[in-house]
């Protein structure tokens, strides 16, 4: 550039030109520097690559050398191995040749097999064609025979008609009264006998016998149509029942057991009515007449004794209860037979009718006999060997031979047949469902040795059951609804109209037939909607609300009723509500606990009731003065309510929910109180932040009220016991501040009765937006600070200016949205302190609670600073339980202990065991309860800051995070942690397990299964996990439930409801045991025992049973048999014991001489004795001599040996098949004594509760006295110290009346509660099955009924001083 010579004109600006060139020079230098840098980088990269290339070259040279050496070595080896390779080659060639030869041989064999199979298939096809041809010919022949029999039957029908005309010509009036109902009247259950029957003469009797024999003899035993059978049935029955021998007595008798043995047990054979004649000559004349009438007629009828029979078509066993009912309705005209019994006949002897028992027992028995279990579906049980053959006459055998000779023997169909030993067990079971007769001596000794059925609860009752209350349930809309959680007392809900009840408590209620004949049934009363039962003098008892749809003839729709409910326009109360009302209500009677329909009138502060509206001019049957001491309590599900006066309690309900609400609203307005109901916390279960007595002042009016701050709403109540508030005040965005006075003068307070607050009271004002201010007068400064702080936080104001210093720091952190870099996290107030506290960290409403907070901190310090050792772990268990129990008793301290533990875990010096034990105590707190609002936010933030999977403290923080989230989802606990829970946290690392605790669950067969759970697991979650692991269905299908044993060691079990926490149940059990055994050491060796047993049994769920369910059901049934609560005779007891022995111990090993290969006789004898003790009824062995016991063991050995090779599932199937033949299989039996009998008589009965109803069984024979279906049960539960059952019988068709019966039984209190809850569960399950509810309010689930009885005396709020 220096060489360039630029000739520029004089006008060029050289200065600018110089600057431009300097700028370009600067740019060139920058580019040059960049180029140098890039060049240097490139050179360095190339140098690096050069070094790497040189390194790779050296490595390659090294590898080349190595490979050359390997090649040299391999060449040497190849030279040596050429000979061995040649030998291997030759060996492989030989092996290939051998394989080829084997393949050729197999191919040849395959071809031969193919040819053989083709020939066999051809042969089978030929045989099938022959069989088909034979079947076709046989069917044609049978069809021809059927036509012949039909024509023959038609002739016989004509003969029957002529003979009937002849019989009618013989005027035998007395005997006509005993005629069997015709085919059209099959719905009648029985025909009562007439007392005025005149005996007939001998000649006329003989003539009638001959005529009847002529009618009955020619009945063929072939398959007939329904029409032909029905045509022949009615005249046959008329003629067969028109003759009564001289001196005979006709009476109604229940069905005998032998009827069930003449056909398979699962058929409804008990519906066949059998008439017997007591004269021996009757049968002889009948057989002679038969032989004389049709000498050449072939018949397939088999006779089962004297008399003749009808041939009936084959029918299927009813598969549903409806089929059973239909068969039961037509049993008079068309008896049924079992599967495959075409030629089996039914005797119609003339001795007595088998009348149906009024209790419904035959229906149960027929249902049990007709029920087929899934294990033997589509199978047929053969009759017992030697049973039916003995009853068959030679003529019947000849008839069978003639039937077989009709053609060639057909091929045997491939039907399932039981093995011999299985058939033997079923044969024994047909007659074995009863108790064997025992000698008086052994029976007396057995009864004396058995524990008494009615025992007093003893000392255990005073400790655990001291607050147990047996509830009372009633049937409302088909569901069991609790109307009282206390037993009924005779004087409760009493009234003047109850005094007219009869002593026997049997009251008549007219039915619709009697109403129509009543003179009071005017059309005007009908149009008014007034029930005729309420107008008549006999209408004391109303239709229960579950069946409360009044007859259409006597009621109108609700919007048309004019007299069932009416208001008065006089005397309007608050808000315009009428304080006078009249209408119909259903009232529970005092003696017979059933619903009575009464006309109630509310007037002038009194409520009176009459029998009908027309009786209002008379003296009322009862009246209640409504004053301030009266109380209204809603019942379960808001279907009933209680009116509690000073003297009595009235249980009331209405015809509809709307009428019920109207009455409650009017009564509330009159009493100026809200109806209390079941305890229900507001806002979805949120507990109050702060509560206490305050004086509320608004518009110059003051009132002392009980106040509670729940969430963002301020509630105030009349008293602390009320569940419904007088009013509420929204606090969100309200202005909260402290003022000097809320009124102008002290005289206002004096007039309001608040003189004690004048000198020292503090005042807060709540001024919501768009509302007038409300003033709160508070007695002490501590209370004022507490209310001010919590109201300010609820209002959404800044909490950094109210509360303690600790709370203000938390408020500042919340205002900063929890900034992790904020220096406030390391503030000394929030961090670890070696010294003790001088004041509480949170605002507490009283000095006593502040003192308790300081003591709580000292307890925590002792727990943290003393090292945990396994030998002395009970010291830390006691400290943790005591500290947490104080927090449960005083919820105000729950946030305090969280703040104390958070303070001691933050910025703590690395002293391992102290920090770990602090986190352990926090891990015990998290499942129990949670802090309030902003404290909960602070705890979550701290846990998030400390969570770290790499350190042990970080893993504890993660565990606490999970525990806090679980507590938020499932709710808080009720009891302090148990010893098992504390020890598991202290000695095991809970963060290593998702379920840190585990406990064994015991089954009825002696096994157990260990199940894991956490601190928030409920019983439902626990059972869901258990069912998944052992292969069972959910409890609503299987009927199983979880039970605990009794802390006292007595033979009592407690069912756990589904919402109970497992840890709470264990803790309450431990507390109860400590109260029972106060002298024992803290770490007792005995722990709670959980049992999984069947509680409810549903026949509709049998098809889905799993193998584990069947095993447990069989084991539980075996225990019932051993305890004497299952009726089986001695022979069947041995069969059942042998089956259970095969399940439990497998095949029986025969005793041999002592040696390595056999079982010693002593060991075998011990095994047999063990089987007898576990599976054989005690009553059959008690007091028996040694020789008899040896004989029993020998018989058991014989029966057990026949089960050789039978698998346990097969034995269980047979066991349950036999056990289910008893109609009350799965029912729960309770020993009770009827209260009508004196205690000296000691006549015990069994109360059997199952899904069909409640049955009363004889205590000795276990035979049914009577059965009450749930549809007839009106009220049940506790009555004083006894069990009460109120029954409404089905109206009698003849008289049109039903009866109300009140039954009282003496039982122990736990058994009364268990029976009551099981009945309620069955009733509600049946209702849910028929009509699934749409989640009615207040409806309890199936498994939540009996949880109220569990350890009620050990509540969380016990033994703690009131520090407020």
Swiss-Prot record:
InterPro entries: Band_41_domain (IPR019749), FERM/acyl-CoA-bd_prot_sf (IPR014352), FERM_2 (IPR035963), FERM_central (IPR019748), FERM_domain (IPR000299), MyTH4_dom (IPR000857), MyTH4_dom_sf (IPR038185), PH-like_dom_sf (IPR011993). Residues 832-986 form the MyTH4 domain. It holds the Pfam family FERM_M. Keywords: Coiled coil, Phosphoprotein, Repeat. CDD domains: FERM_B-lobe, FERM_C-lobe_PLEKHH1_PLEKHH2, PH1_PLEKHH1_PLEKHH2. It comes from the Eukaryota. GO terms for cellular component: cytoskeleton. Residues 997-1333 form the FERM domain. Residues 578-672, 687-796 form the PH domain. Residues 28-169 form a coiled coil. Residues 184-266, 296-321, 356-395, 487-529, 546-568 are annotated as: Disordered. The modification Phosphoserine is found at residue 745. Residues 364-379 have a biased composition (Basic and acidic residues). Residues 237-246, 509-520 have a biased composition (Polar residues). PANTHER family: PLECKSTRIN HOMOLOGY DOMAIN-CONTAINING FAMILY H MEMBER 1, PLEKHH PROTEIN. This is Pleckstrin homology domain-containing family H member 1. It comes from Homo sapiens.
